[in-house]
Every structure is written in structure tokens, then in C-alpha cells.
């Protein structure tokens, strides 16, 4: 099971991402601002961090920089800021992908899978997916969702 940290100050977005990813077999912890996201990041082990850019206390850009100083963990920005300058600033901070709101949850899920697989070095040839069940043939584990 993959573990994801989702930080967004909008409750509806946090909850919809959490519910969707958990239904797909992920473990998800959420934060309402960048400061609490960094606390969770330092206290837990995650496979991916999803950050909103505009959050109270510590914004997503600063949170991404802090994550990047401590880890090479994939970071995905999820934000309403969709101008070219925002994209460039996000990538300069060290993010691995950038999704503009509104977004389909199915696309976010596939981006999460892609980033985590690349980070963990998971070869898709070692995976078998059938009817909502994924088998990791390399370690003989099954994931439902």
C-alpha cells in the first residue's frame, strides 16, 4: 500500500482526494496548511506528497523546498494557480508534477501512480492488473482498488 500526504486548505478537496485514493488502496494523511503538512512529513514515511500552493502559515512552494531539502520524495502541486510563471516557480522549487484545479480524480490517481512507481523503481512489467486487483509479481503482493 502506498502512503500519500495531501495538504490543501480546502476541506472538500482534501476529503475527495483522501476518499478516492483510499478507495484505490492508498493510505492517506491530510493537512490543512503547509506547517502541519511539514510536521506530518517529518513524523511519518510517505511515498508521495501532494501540496496546494496557496495555504496558510507555510505556502506550498516553501513546503516543497523543505521537503526537497530532506528527501527526493515525489512532490505534486495541486493548485488553482495555472499561469506559466506559477508552473515555472513550482518546478524551480523542486516539484515533480503540477495539476491545475479543477481536475478529474482519475487523472490525479494515475499521476500519483506514475510518480510513485518512478520513485520506487517499480517496473510495470512486474504488475498484473485485473478487475480492480493489482498483483506485484516482484514481491508477491496484491492490492485491491
Predicted regions and their residues:
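Short, Lys/Arg-enriched segments at the junction into DNA-binding effector domains
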Residues: 3, 113-145
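Active-site residues of response regulator receiver
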Residues: 8, 52, 79
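The feature encodes the CheY-like receiver
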Residues: 14, 56, 83, 101
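Charged docking surfaces used in two-component/phosphorelay signaling
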Residues: 15-23
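Short hydrophobic/Thr-rich beta-strand motif most characteristic of the beta2 strand and flanking loop
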Residues: 25-32, 40
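Acidic catalytic/metal-coordinating carboxylates
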Residues: 33-36, 59-62
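Active-site beta3 strand of CheY-like receiver
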Residues: 44-50
